[in-house]
Amino acid sequence: MEYFIYNIENLTDAEYEKWFSLMTEDKQEKVSRYKSLTRRKCSVAGEMLVKNHIGRALNLAPESLIILADENGKPYMENCRTKFNISHCENILVYAFSNEEIGIDIEKIKPISLKVLKSFFSENEQEYVSGNVLNADNPESYNSPEILERFYRIYTLKEAICKKSGIGIKGLKDADALPFLDQSFKENDYIISIIK
């Protein structure tokens, strides 16, 4: 398993235009509908980086490779044993490769809402995040650095589990993240989780 981190600010206009033009017509339409330039750049950069990596590994021209998506949006390449997954948050893109199914997610550590915690986390996950110090009367208690890091570890693990399995975020509530805490790490102000 390998993973990479890429800042899309490094994507030149020429690279963006070249790789956008090499996307399928459907993908070009999808990317063009994104209102955010950052999101458009992440989509194009993700495709460029994955194709370059797999192209080098298979000794194929990256431009000849086509990334498809299954019914749940999970990316894949036909006739390719290498599995990959991509995620982005703001200007940071992460992508991972493996010989097995893989899921990756990244989130920037920022204040949270208890509503998300209660809606998508099991009781055990809520207890792990809170460390039994959450105080409903004191909203600041759930935005301490330790609580936030725990929250984003669980959240990104749940997303990575769902992405690996291909079920999408509809399985977020049922994904059990606690057994995979060692597959999550902090990188600057971000939490990254990789499930293989």
Where are the regions that the model predicts?
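Core catalytic alpha/beta fold that binds nucleotide/phospho-ligands
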Residues: 1-196
